Amino acid sequence: MLNRYPLWKYLMVFFAIITAALYALPNIYGEDPAIQVTGARGASVDMSTLDAVTTALDKEQLSHKSIALENGSILVRFNDTDTQISARDVISEALGKDTIVALNLAPSTPDWLEAIGASPLKLGLDLRGGVHFLMEVDMDAAMEKLVGQQEEAFRSELREAKIRYRAIRPSGKEAVEVLLRNEEQLAEAKAMLEKNHPDMLFVESDSNGRYALTATFTEQRLQEIRNYAVEQNITILRNRVNELGVAEPLVQRQGASRIVVELPGVQDTARAKEILGATATLEFREVDDKADLSAAANGRAPAGSEIKMDRDGRPVVLKKRVILGGQSITDASSSVDEYGRPQVNISLDSEGGNKMSAFSKKNIGKLMATVFAEYKDSGRRTPEGKVILDKHEEVINQATIQSALGRNFRITGIDSAAEAHNLALLLRAGALIAPISIVEERTIGPSMGQQNIDMGIQACIWGMVAVMLFTLLYYRGFGLIANIALMANLVLIIGVMSMIPGATMTLPGIAGIVLTVGMAVDANVLIFERIREELRDGRSPQQAIHQGYANAFSTIADANITTLITAIILFAVGTGAVKGFAVTLSIGILTSMFTAIIGTRCIVNLIYGGKRVDKLSI
């Protein structure tokens, strides 16, 4: 019999729409301003932490809707954002540096919906408000640092092998040149270094009594270095974001050397920019106490040493070899010494502790300097438009090694408590592998985000109203069926997106929904026009319905599959905003095919199937 579906098809459509509606429902309930408290660096929060938070809020008379310990973190809900911001400062002061206190928005989803895993869609930066940074990793500086490390490695290895050399110096941006005394030493050095460094290419040259060995990295190794610089910087930026206390941040790679950082809900954008863009780190160097100070004042330093200035502008001669860098620091905190001066307490990892212990044992009575290094925007750009960074280094502390140092010690010579606090924060989060510059900054206020939501919803509503009026007036009864399918399609899109872990609704995503609303009716228009053609050809209403759906299917499938391929390509090659549009469009294409072909057919079959029909309302 024509136009009859088996029972399972009706049940499939019914349960699909009901399931989507349940998962879309949490988006109606909205969100509460909240604070999330989690442990820092592996620490955990427990009931004692919960009591401390409650006590701190009660002491300052800050009211809250609820407070609970859930999944290893404390969630405090508030009635308004003003109380939320005040409470963040109070809780941070009460708990100290062992916790991360983050502003958040907690969904007001009922427990029965949470029990089935239903949660509202996450809103992107353009809808929620916040700050967007596009950062570029300075690969030239990364290579300069690596070449310097290779110079030191070559010096140590040649000394250990007792091969005498004239000089070791950089050659260009990505190579090291070793000058030897004779041909025999050149051959020995090449054999030894090739064995120790299989990822480098060594080319020897012998002209006019100049014996040189030029070492360059293989192309594969260069690519690994570049990838490592970007990936490590991403990890460190994530640590810094955690220190800032931002919930649900986005830190991801874009292209070969760029990183996107999005911080939803951040109000203090200047502070975020200061911490994320900072390139400060520490180096511990041995002071060359045998150097001629008068020569140093004129800018001359002995071989193996270099001149750095202290904060008073006086020259200090330091050995080029770095005892320890910021990468060995596992923890740092700011405090004051017995004289009330700011200081930073440093803890090293086991390898760094062993290096510091071994060095200090051999150099008791000698001076060790703490060098503060930072890259700053020079205001200049390359012909390609890249920001040129200048490296600023200064000696902030010189101390005599009184005894063997271990994994924990302190540094002084810092100007202010605020500087000590910032330096400790950066050292805790980790030193950047290569300096970064902010090439794009965009701030979206919460009111602008809400305006985007309101305008997006209005566009969706008016788009649906216009389409529904047209189909209702032009196709009458069948137009009403198409309108029911259109509303079901919208529920399916929101429901499916709410089910996808990590899916984010953005303004381009809303544009994708509005576009899908128009596209969803296309399939119904094709079907209804085919039914009209079949009726004009003299077929009965039942045959016209059957042939209309059957003949229109291939056209609908072809059109939607080609659009789906385009959406997949957009997702594969696009950035954040384009990806959001592509995801929504892809889901919309699939759901519109489902509702237009199967959904409307179910309704049509229920109304007309198995009955004698003389006329169709189309």
From Swiss-Prot:
Gene3D superfamilies the record matches: 3.30.1360.200, 3.30.70.260, 3.30.70.3400, Multidrug efflux transporter AcrB transmembrane domain
Mutagenesis or variant effect for R240M: Nearly abolishes protein translocation
Record's subcellular location: Cell membrane
Substitution effect: D206N: Nearly abolishes protein translocation
A molecular-function term among this protein's GO annotations: protein-transporting ATPase activity
Pfam families: Sec_GG (PF07549), SecD-TM1 (PF13721), SecD_1st (PF21760), SecD_SecF_C (PF02355), SecDF_P1_head (PF22599)
Entry-linked InterPro entries: Acrflvin-R (IPR001036), SecD (IPR005791), SecD-TM (IPR027398), SecD/SecF_arch_bac (IPR022813), SecD/SecF_CS (IPR022646), SecD_1st (IPR048631), SecD_SecF_C (IPR048634), SecD_SecF_C_bact (IPR055344)
Top-level lineage group: Bacteria
NCBIfam families, alphabetized: 2A0604s01, secD
Record function comment: Part of the Sec protein translocase complex. Interacts with the SecYEG preprotein conducting channel. SecDF uses the proton motive force (PMF) to complete protein translocation after the ATP-dependent function of SecA.
Family the UniProt entry places it in: Belongs to the SecD/SecF family. SecD subfamily.
Name of the protein in its database record: Protein translocase subunit SecD
Source organism (scientific name): Vibrio alginolyticus
Lineage, broadest ranks: Bacteria, Pseudomonadati, Pseudomonadota, Gammaproteobacteria, Vibrionales
